[in-house]
Design a protein with these regions (language model features):
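Flexible hinge/switch segments at interdomain interfaces of large molecular machines
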Residues: 119, 164-165, 296-307
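Short, hydrophobic beta-strand segments
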Residues: 125-128, 171-173, 304-308
Length: 308
């Protein structure tokens, strides 16, 4: 894998704007599923509570391949109760896709997440979704997004954001909302055109744990983006806990994301998102780092998602 061709993106929006549906469209277009496999809509909503409520609570990781690019995609919560989850995730990506409903426009939660993305210097790609709705107003919604970004202090470059129109549900994206296409290639082309590849940083390894996964076979799995250096399968590492304590442990397996699943690998370089298997004790916000010279990354705020 050419690590200059890895792109990390997050999909952010208010609840019901179509985030999970868009991620599903990425996966379907990239032929993640075989012809005889049944594709369940809202593939990313795998948690039982999420399927029951029809909203995304926890961030998920998957990846698609497009024109020799590996695109790591994080589908983030859109519900206001989980804003810290969103804030945590956008710090691991190269840019965000800001998805807005073509009838409703940007909502309060959109404002919060967008502000966080702008503050750390990300330039969003704006997708005006659901343009097939009879009450859609895509041009007005575009102006609303521009005005919102301006009010949030966006730079001149950030205000020059690309905008794509389409219907994730119907599997198309294009430049003109009045001219439906038959795929989402226009959005994928825009992603690889405007998003810079991650910068590789040499040195002792560092990875901030930004989310957790779980396997019945291996237990808890640490997920995050390698910030510096190289993580290797079987290497001895230190875990710098948020309270300042440092523990020594060993990586049993390293996985990258491929489609909806994990792919075991020997090494992961800086800039890629990976899953680390076999660590003893860890939490979100801890740093996996060099065994001999442990160096923590700045911690992140944690709020446990709760729903009534």
């Amino acid at each position: 894998m050419d690590y200059q061709k890895i792109i990390n993106i997050a999909v952010i929006a208010h609840v019901d704007a179509g985030k999970s549906t868009l991620v599903d469209a990425f996966l379907k277009q990239s032929h993640v599923f075989k012809d005889n496999e049944k594709v369940v809509d809202c593939i990313m909503d795998s948690n039982d509570l999420e399927r029951e409520r029809g909203i995304t609570i926890y961030s998920k990781n998957c990846s698609v391949t497009y024109k020799d690019y590996k695109i790591n995609i994080v589908d983030t919560p859109g519900h206001a109760d989980f804003s810290s989850e969103v804030e945590r995730i956008i710090k691991t990506v190269d840019t965000v896709i800001l998805l807005v409903d073509s009838a409703e426009g940007p909502m309060p939660q959109t404002r919060f997440v967008l502000q966080k993305a702008l503050e750390i210097g990300l330039k969003p790609i704006v997708v005006v979704n659901k343009v097939d709705k009879p009450n859609c107003r895509p041009e007005e919604v575009y102006e609303m997004v521009f005005d919102l970004m301006f009010s949030l202090g966006a730079t001149e470059d950030q205000l020059d954001f690309p905008v794509i129109y389409g219907s994730a549900k119907n599997g198309w994206m294009g430049e003109d909302y009045s001219k439906p296409t038959d795929n989402i290639d226009y959005l994928l082309d825009k992603i690889v055109e405007v998003i810079p590849a991650p910068t590789q940083i040499d040195g002792d390894p560092q990875m901030l744990i930004t989310s957790l996964d779980f396997s019945n076979y291996t237990g808890r799995i640490a997920v995050g983006r390698v910030h510096r250096g190289v993580m290797r399968d079987g290497m001895n590492v230190s875990i710098c806990h948020r309270d300042g304590k440092v523990e020594k442990t060993k990586i049993k397996e390293l996985h990258t994301f491929e489609g909806m699943g994990h792919l075991k690998t020997d090494m992961v370089e800086s800039g890629d998102i990976c899953a680390v298997v076999g660590l003893d004790r860890f939490e979100i916000g801890d740093t996996i780092t060099d065994f001999e010279n442990p160096e923590a990354l700045p911690p992140i705020a944690i709020d446990e998602p709760t729903m009534s």
